Swiss-Prot record:
Family: Belongs to the TIM50 family.
Pfam families noted in UniProt: NIF
All residue ranges annotated as the FCP1 homology domain in the record: 243-387
Gene, per the UniProt record: scpl-4
Biological classification of the source: Eukaryota, Metazoa, Ecdysozoa, Nematoda, Chromadorea
Keywords, in A-Z order: Membrane, Mitochondrion, Mitochondrion inner membrane, Protein transport, Transit peptide, Translocation, Transmembrane, Transmembrane helix, Transport
Transit peptide extent on chain: 1-23
Keyword tRNA processing: no
Compositionally biased region (Low complexity): 131-144
Protein name: Mitochondrial import inner membrane translocase subunit TIM50
Record localization: Mitochondrion inner membrane
Entry keyword annotation includes Transmembrane: yes
GO terms under biological process: protein import into mitochondrial matrix
Length: 452
């Protein structure tokens, strides 16, 4: 039996090709023996089969073959390879066939039963490796083996325990919510009592739904605490005589008008003082104006900043975020709660949304972003000083006029320069006319202006 037929009977087609390829590399060449030494000539050499990929990409380890099995495989290869070559030589040249027969070595012995047993054992080992590789690949793919009865019982017990804990937690949460709601209604729906334990009557007393009305009123108070200013009257009453109460009140935003917040890795969070701020406060400070800081910043942040740049106490009052009205995500200043006449209130800010409740009192100026070459406060101080000197009974028309410009202070400066030039021209015109009259009298013989 030839080697190819033997392998086909013991292996599948793919495995037979692999086996023949591994053990059929030694053949007799017509050109003579190869120049390279046969590696199987060394009996002490052991050959390792390479890794062979078969069946769904599984990989099998190399198989170490003993020396005696290698020699038998060489004999099988020589028999398989020489038979077709001899037939081909018979067709091409009889002379070469005769020389081949005379010089060919004696035929190899027929395969014995031991070789067949080895091949069968090799096939069994390959099948075992294939099954082991398939199991390892299936386990690495994430499949779980629940065939173990103990493991299945443990999983079922864990699932039941989780269901029980979830059910208990839901019961506790639902019960706690019910108890909390009842306690809330009882606490905020009860009538108030005085120090002696007597019930204080309110507008809801005597009604069957009085507890629910009181609960709704509590919600309204919470909303007002967040949305509305902290008190109805933000400023105290004007100063009585003999103290001097300024005629006009200036309400000014702190952030990005007088100072600018800045954060760096080196200094951290700090506020930059705007150039000419001291001059600005000297011009508008008491007793010229009643200055009020009305900022959307918190008192904890803004109060120390105001105290640091105003050691002379030129700012009379300070109002912070708790005194603003929260509307549509913005902190709005409600000037109607200042306890002052709005016809004499000047509100200075860069954000139009902050003064949306009183736009006629707002003087909108550009936002200062920290540039240290800014001189807008000087021009703004001159504008406010002009309003003070005008002694107007209602400042709102002037504020509305200058608010139509992007930079009211710059527009005021431009108009002030223009008016000063007009005044200079008016002063020069009478001098020129008097000189002409004086010289015209001399030219025409008139002596009326000699003594002038």
């Amino acid at each position: 039996m030839s080697l190819s037929k033997l392998t086909q009977t013991c292996f599948s087609r793919h495995q037979a090709k692999t086996f023949i390829r591994l053990y059929s590399s030694d053949f007799k060449s017509l050109l003579g023996p190869p120049a390279v030494a046969n590696p199987y000539a060394d009996n002490g050499r052991t050959r390792f089969a390479p890794i062979v990929p078969i069946n769904h990409g599984n990989v099998f380890a190399s198989i170490k073959l003993p020396i005696n099995e290698t020699q038998e495989a060489i004999a099988f290869k020589s028999e398989v390879e020489e038979a077709p070559k001899v037939e081909k030589l018979e067709v091409e040249s009889p002379k070469i066939e005769a020389e081949k027969v005379l010089s060919s070595p004696p035929p190899a012995p027929a395969p014995t039963s031991s070789a067949i047993d080895e091949l069968n054992s090799l096939k069994d080992s390959l099948e075992k490796l294939e099954s082991a590789a398939s199991k390892s690949s299936s386990s690495s793919g994430g499949s779980s083996d629940n065939s173990d009865p103990g493991n299945a019982e443990e999983i079922e017990a864990r699932r039941k325990r989780m269901e029980r804990n979830t059910r208990i937690g839901a019961y506790v949460l639902f019960g706690g919510s019910i108890i909390g709601f009842i306690s809330f209604c009882f606490y905020y729906g009860r009538a108030q009592r005085d120090e002696f334990g007597n019930v204080i009557s309110d507008e809801f007393s005597g009604s069957f739904l009085a507890p629910f009305y009181r609960i709704a009123n509590s919600f309204k108070l919470w909303r007002d605490y967040v949305v509305e200013p902290a008190r109805e009257q933000l400023l105290p009453d004007p100063l009585p005589a003999p103290y001097l109460q300024p005629k006009y009140t200036i309400v000014i935003e702190l952030k990005n008008i007088l100072v600018h917040p800045e954060w760096t890795y080196k200094t951290g969070y700090r506020f930059l003082k705007r150039p000419a701020l001291d001059y600005f406060l000297d011009v508008i400070g008491y007793p010229n104006f009643e200055v009020v800081i009305y900022s959307s910043e918190s008192m904890m942040t803004a109060a120390p900043v105001v105290d640091s740049f105003d050691p002379k106490q030129r700012i009379m009052y300070k109002l912070f975020r708790d005194c603003t009205k929260y509307m549509n995500g913005h902190h709005v200043k409600d000037l109607s709660k200042l306890n002052r006449d709005l016809s004499k209130v000047i509100y200075i800010d860069f954000d139009a949304k902050s003064g949306q409740l009183n736009p006629e009192n707002m003087l909108r100026v550009p936002e200062w972003k920290g540039n240290m070459d800014d001189t807008s406060l000087v021009d703004l101080a001159e504008l406010l000083k002009t309003i003070h000197l005008s002694d107007a009974e209602d400042v709102r028309p002037m504020l509305q006029y200058y608010s139509q410009y992007d930079d009211p202070a710059k527009e005021f400066r431009r108009r002030a320069v223009y008016l000063s030039q007009q005044e200079e021209q008016k002063k020069q015109q009478p001098d020129d006319s008097s000189m002409l009259k004086r010289y015209s009298g001399r030219l025409f013989g008139s002596r009326r202006h000699v003594n002038a």
